Every structure is written in C-alpha cells, then in structure tokens.
Amino acid sequence: MSEAIRLTQLSHGGGCGCKIAPAVLAEMLKTLPQAQLFPDLLVGHETADDAAVYRLNDEQAIVATTDFFMPIVDDPFDFGRIAATNAISDIYAMGGKPILALAIVGMPVNTLPIAAIQKIMEGGASVCAVAGIPLAGGHTIDAPEPIYGLVALGLVHPQRVKKNSAARAGDVLVLGKPLGVGILGSTMKAGKLDAEAYRQLIDTTTQLNTVGTALGALDAVHALTDVTGFGLLGHLLEICRGSGLSARIEAGRLPLLPAAVEFAKQGIGPGAIGRNLASFGDAVAFDAAVPEWQRRVMADAQTSGGLLAAVAPDSVDEVLALFHAQGFAAACVVGELQAGEPRVGVVA
C-alpha cells in the first residue's frame, strides 16, 4: 500500500458504496422512456440487469456496460485493478464473454501526482490483460475526486442471456464470493486495516468472475447477477422483483471474509449499509434470531462482489463444481427462491 498517497482520503465515498440508494435510483429512472421501439434490444434498463444486451444476429448479441467509482483502497495500482475487475464482472453476470474495454478517468490532476494516475490506469490495464481483452481507449476529465472505471463490451448468444427476470420457483441460490468488502474498505479508510485483512480485501476484489461465461452455457442456470453496491439483499430483491418470486436466505450459510466479521460486530461499515436497509423497507424480513451485525453484512455494499446464481435444484452440484474449479473456494448454497410476493425472508 502507498504510504505517501491515501486515495481514500481524497473522496467522500469508495467503491460500489458510491452507488445511489436503490429507492432513489428507482425514482430517478421513472421518467425514462421504455424501449419497445427497439426489438433487438434484449435487455434494457427496465429489469435492473447488470448490462444492456443488443442482438446483432441469430447467433450473437453484444453486451454493454459501464462502471466506475471512487477509491476503496489507497494504493493506486490496486484501485485500478479493483475498478476494472468490477466493471468487467457485469459482462460475466449476463453469461457473456468480454471482448473490449474503454477507460473512464476523472482525476484531480492538480492534487494527485501524474505517477499515481499512471499506476491507476496501469492497474486497470493489467486486469484487462488477464481477461484477455484490449483496453482500447477511453476518456479523461479533470475532477475534484479520483474516479476510475471502464466501459466493457462482450458477446453472448441471444438465447443464453442470463436475465434477472428468468428465475423460477424452487431455484437454489448459489453465491460465488464471500461478503464483507465494504466493511473492510471502511475499516481501511479509518486506518484500522492490518496486512492480512488487506490481503483478503485485494484477493477477492481482483478475482475476475470468469465463471459467468461457463454458467451462461448452462440451461439450468436460470438467472445470474453480481453482488455489488446494493448488497446481497438488494441484488437478490432485483431477481425477486424481476421474476415475481420470494426468496429465503439462511444467514448462517453465508460465506464471509474472515477479517470482516469482527469489524462488522463493531458496527464498522460504509454509509451504504444504512441506505440499503432503508431502501428495502418491508421487502426484507429478518428472523429475530438473526443478529444485527449479520443483517448489516447482507446489506453491505460489495465492490467487485461474487456472482449470485439461481440454479435448478438437480444442477446445484454441477454449478458448485464449476465455481470451485475456477478458484471460487467460498462458493456455496445460501438459500432458495419460492412462489410468492417479491420479498426476501432471512432466517438464522
């Protein structure tokens, strides 16, 4: 980590915790026109999916997304890596394969040394190289706070697109990465994160969700999303609302970053936790036995979080094997979808 520059002190928020709260975002989007005039637009903004999908022909559709945010860590290179990993994840979350990226760069050029900005951009480029795609260009502006991210493009078969609206009653919910990223990010901003906790933070946030491409080829994976700024509960609610289903989550089965547990019990976390919980309202019901710290973890804003898959029950073992084979050791079953009103019930 850089000792000379603390990127997290140059911004008011960090990572996907910068997202506007779900309820506020929904209000903002109300006046946007629907997309009925574009029959080849397979996925637009109406279903809260991770990316737009536009059919090119019977065999190919383009997946398009953009994602950017302010620093969640102090090290410039790591910030670039995390932001790029997070942006490309949306392609995988649609079942697609990334093909190209463009950089989005907003930097306080009179405050932040050029060398630090270069490291941020190099970090992003390094992740694109791992993903096997070119960082082909981008756009830069002078901004009061550091902002970095990508436009990412990918390809998917039009019949293999994984939408939030396609989950089915009885589907089992599989989560690919442990929770607690936002909590560790807030701990770092407070200057309380040790080297081991930082390693856990970096390891999970720079792991590309490459398994999404393989999951996209499976008919048994009915819906797929990545868990980011709205937390596990918020993104699960998007699936519930899109598919007209209810969900049941078992808090005791959730994979957690070990270093995040104690900080969560201390009440440390981003402001997005409170905003998310307030936005859920009565759409989320917690069993009395679920402790407050676990409730906060489930609403914690994840940056570059894991994939959440809705899977046919008889294919759960196959899906878990795919996750584990690609290095997602924490992947596990966390709940199920049921017929009912779009809401989430959480039991201990």
Model-predicted segments: where are they?
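Helix-biased detector of long, well-ordered alpha-helical tracts
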Residues: 1-348
